[in-house]
UniProtKB/Swiss-Prot annotation:
Example GO biological process: L-arabinose catabolic process to xylulose 5-phosphate
Transmembrane segments annotated in the record for this chain: none
Species, as recorded: Klebsiella pneumoniae subsp. pneumoniae (strain ATCC 700721 / MGH 78578)
Protein name per UniProt: L-arabinose isomerase
Coiled-coil ranges per UniProt: none
Family: Belongs to the arabinose isomerase family.
Role of this protein: Catalyzes the conversion of L-arabinose to L-ribulose.
Enzyme Commission identifier(s): 5.3.1.4
Cofactor comment: Binds 1 Mn(2+) ion per subunit.
Length: 500
């Protein structure tokens, strides 16, 4: 069972009574066939639920109102089977607060050249009925998603499925609670921001809990529960001699297990699905949570270090979007560079907290090593290399008057040499279009040093996310050129300034 099983998407057919009851019966029959086929064959993440035809303003308003108040409804897919005068949709669209996708399709794929007549033409009017619907969306300044293609087309299925992921993610985000254990890393700017503005824009709430509250729960964990979790560690990872039974760091592994169980219990009791820590606020904890954070991210929790609540929330959002897709999604940080005459690389990592969902198939190593900051005992952590292939890194920043999402497309590459003295998980990548352009553009646009790294999602996913939440998107990819990139930032400043 996944988060998508908690939601459904309503399939709404737009028509009118102009064409008579027989035409509406055929429309209904077509709609039933399409919905049943999509549910059975399209591999959509959510179930489609067919709703009654929308043929009058009152019917349409009723459907939209019901969608707003149904917690299971993640959004609406609308198909304009016949012509549906768009003034009928104004009241409904005015009150609708769920994501909307217009499926610009028709029942038949090919025209019946020998038999086509005006009855057929009146029944199958997506081509211009869809344009009428598009106009009212533009007139109302309500941007919605559009997918064009026959309902049996696999590309259309994939695009609808991708939109469904966004719709469910948006509903989940409205209920998302982010727990900050302690505050920001002192004097750091980009990890701070306006939590009230974020809750208004995205729906997630951010609040702080004292580390002492967490410590109370951590200390209440039983030895039996710790032993059972360590058994799981033994079967899931390759433990170094120091971490094994009778190893000189075995107690550190037991302490890490206690922290993991305590953190998970605290998060579950509070209904949190994202959290932050900071190495400057660990009073009462024996070590900086490393292994615990890695495993909680693997279970779907959002996380970021140093109190970075925006990245923690973004990680949770992107994990929901990517549920069930190939590839992983993790907290990440651009750590250091490898300059090599145009073959420049970025080594990404963090102090400890990289999610195992992005690891290669090889079992991660569980090790205990010193950590030079935090002033605590040596923390346990998982060490691994990352899968190779196309990926993205994304950063959400607060510019004061708006939120900006930065996305850089990258290519993850194999590590050319062993890293015997680097005791943390890491990823090595080529930034697109090249490191010079990508880093300069990122810096000019104010991108954070913390990011969300994902093999599972792509630029189109993040573009749709930005559109759904009406936030600025700044893209750095193979098409990026710095002069035009700077121009776009200036234009965005004017555009978003006009919306204040």
């Amino acid at each position: 069972m996944t988060i998508f099983d908690n939601y459904e998407v309503w399939f709404v057919i737009g028509s009118q009574h102009l064409y008579g009851p027989e035409a509406l019966r055929q429309v209904t029959k077509h709609a039933e066939h399409v919905v049943n086929s999509l549910n059975a064959e399209a591999k959509l993440p959510c179930k489609l639920v067919l709703k009654p035809l929308g043929t009058t303003p009152d019917e349409i308003t009723h459907i939209c109102r019901d969608a707003n108040y149904d917690d299971k409804c993640a959004g609406l897919v609308v198909w304009l089977h016949t012509f549906s005068p768009a003034k009928m949709w104004i009241n409904g669209l005015t009150i609708l607060n769920k994501p909307l996708l217009q499926f610009h399709t028709q029942y038949n794929a090919a025209l019946p050249w020998d038999s086509i007549d005006m009855d057929f033409m009146n029944l199958n009017q997506t081509a211009h009925g869809g344009r009428e619907f598009g106009f009212i969306g533009a007139r109302m300044r309500q941007q919605h998603s559009v997918v064009t293609g026959h309902w049996q087309d696999k590309e259309a299925h994939q695009r609808i499925g991708g939109w469904m992921r966004q719709a469910v993610s948006k509903q989940d985000t409205r209920h998302l609670k982010v727990c900050r254990f302690g505050d920001n890393m002192r004097e750091v700017a980009v990890t701070d921001g306006d939590k009230v503005a974020a809750q208004i824009k995205f729906g997630f709430s951010v609040n702080t809990w004292a580390v002492g509250d967490l410590v109370q729960v951590v200390n209440s964990i039983s030895d039996g529960d710790i032993s059972a979790l360590v058994d799981e560690y033994e079967s899931s990872y390759r433990l170094t001699p120091a971490a094994q039974v009778h190893g000189d760091k075995r107690q550190n592994v037991l302490d890490a297990a206690r922290i993991e169980l305590g953190m998970k219990r605290f998060l579950e009791q509070g209904g949190f699905h994202a959290f932050t820590t900071t190495f400057e606020d660990l009073h009462g904890l024996k070590q900086l949570p490393g292994l615990a954070v890695q495993r909680l991210m693997q279970q779907g929790y959002g996380f970021a270090g140093e109190g970075d609540w925006k990245t923690a929330a973004l990680l949770r959002i992107m994990k929901v979007m990517s549920t069930g897709l190939q590839g992983g999604t993790s907290f990440m940080e651009d750590y250091t560079y490898h300059f090599d005459n145009g073959n420049d690389l970025v080594l990404g990592s963090h102090m400890l907290e990289v999610c195992p969902t992005i690891a290669t198939a090889e079992k991660p190593i569980l090790d205990v090593q010193p950590l030079g900051i935090g002033g605590k005992a040596d923390p346990a952590r998982l060490i691994f290399n990352t899968q190779t292939g196309p990926a993205i890194v994304a950063s959400l920043i607060d510019l004061g008057d708006r939120f900006r999402l930065l996305v850089n497309t990258i290519e993850t590459v194999p590590t050319p040499h062993d890293l015997p003295k680097l005791p943390v998980a890491n990823a090595l990548w080529k930034a697109q279009p090249d490191l010079r352009t990508a880093s300069e553009a990122w810096i000019i646009a104010g991108g954070a040093h913390h990011t969300v790294f994902s093999h599972a999602l792509n630029l189109d996913d993040m573009r749709q996310f930005a559109e759904l939440h009406d936030i600025e998107l700044t893209v750095i990819d193979n098409d990026t050129r710095l002069p035009s990139f700077k121009d776009a930032l200036r234009w965005n400043e004017v555009y978003y300034g006009s919306k204040r």
